[in-house]
Amino acid sequence: AETTAAGAGLATARGPGGSGAGAAQRTTLVDMQPDLLPPATAPAAVGLVTAAACLIKADQPMYYAACPEEGNNKKVVEENGKWYCEATQKTYDTCRRRYILRLKVQDHSGAGWVNVFHEQAREMLGVDAEDLHAIRESDPAEYERVVKRAQFKDWHLKLKAKTEEYQGESRRRLTVLQCAVPDYAAEAKHLLERIRAVWA
């Protein structure tokens, strides 16, 4: 997939499926995870963060088997070498692998776990889910190397933060809506502007 420099377009692009995650401002991971969480009924917050992917667990499920029909990303179950989709009530000879993973990211303010879905995960890992599955099946050592190579890389992320209720407890869920390779010249300019604002 083609990468986008400097996070171009991230500030105004809408979230996946036109979810309405609109204009976003630069922020930090700590600011997106306040100690006092908003209620679950509050709208999601959207922000732009430059952070490094500092931990991807190679032993975690990083993708799932999805229905091969275009536009249907529902999970399928393997049965006797075939794949059954409950959504379509059909059995298929093949399936598609789609990413769904959690990774830890860190910026200057702190760290947080984010959920990353197919398109963004493919960008960040640098390999398609089908290819990663084939590597995992044939060469577990290479699979671990591929995952490790994706760590400690900087990304300009458009994040959505939403409070969720789970078993009576509130927690903050961070989701990567978009990702791009940072433009370090633009980042340096932004930092300079912040320093000047402090001393103005």
Kindly give the residue locations of the regions a language model identified.
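Single-stranded nucleic acid-binding proteins centered on OB/S1-type folds
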Residues: A1-A200
